[in-house]
A protein has these predicted regions:
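Catalytic or ion-coupling anion/metal-binding cores of large enzyme and transporter domains
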Residues: 1-29, 88-156
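Function-dense linear segments that define catalytic or interfacial modules
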Residues: 16-77, 81
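Short beta-alpha connecting loops at secondary-structure transitions
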Residues: 41-45, 85-94
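Generic secondary-structure signature for well-ordered alpha-helical cores
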Residues: 62, 66, 80-84, 106-114
Length: 156
């Protein structure tokens, strides 16, 4: 099979997420080797600006993947992009985002990039964030992630 060409039948998944009050659907399909091969985004009604922009972003991501652009290079510019809709999501691994593009970049990174590449982008799973917090608070005087302070009463 030629580079960048996906099999006729391929595995993938669709993630539904609400950002603010808007519902998005992200479909990610993989190549035979298990790497990410193409992305589809659905947002709002067909023909609206949002639907067109989401589709254009998905086409750009998929074209980059077809030309062997590393996924980290494709998602890096989207991380932290700020525009509406933004705010809280119903995805426990990504509870808050600055935009739909920010969410897509983070979700693709979590699902498709190995830990070292995600860590270089500052993207961690919920479990990894908890582990990082526990390591950061595991210093002298810390117990079970909580700071224990000794207070001395007497002369001041």
């Amino acid at each position: 099979m030629a580079s960048g060409v996906l099999p006729r039948r391929r595995s993938g998944y669709t993630t539904a997420v609400t950002i603010g009050a808007e519902r998005f659907y992200l479909t990610a399909n993989q190549r035979d080797d298990g790497s990410l091969g193409e992305v589809f985004l659905h947002w709002g009604k067909h023909g609206t600006s949002g639907a067109g922009l989401a589709n254009s972003y998905a086409i750009a991501l998929s074209a980059g993947l077809a030309h062997q652009v590393p996924l980290a290079d494709l998602v890096r510019p989207g991380i932290g992009q700020f525009f509406v809709p933004n705010g809280h999501t119903d995805d426990p691994e990504i509870p808050r985002v600055r935009s739909a593009v920010d969410y897509i970049a983070r979700r693709l990174a979590i699902d498709w990039l190995p830990y070292p590449e995600r860590a270089a982008l500052g993207i961690y799973t919920l479990t990894e964030r908890v582990q990082r917090w526990e390591r950061a608070t595991a210093f002298a005087g810390a117990r079970d992630g909580y700071l224990c302070r000794t207070q001395t009463f007497g002369s001041m």
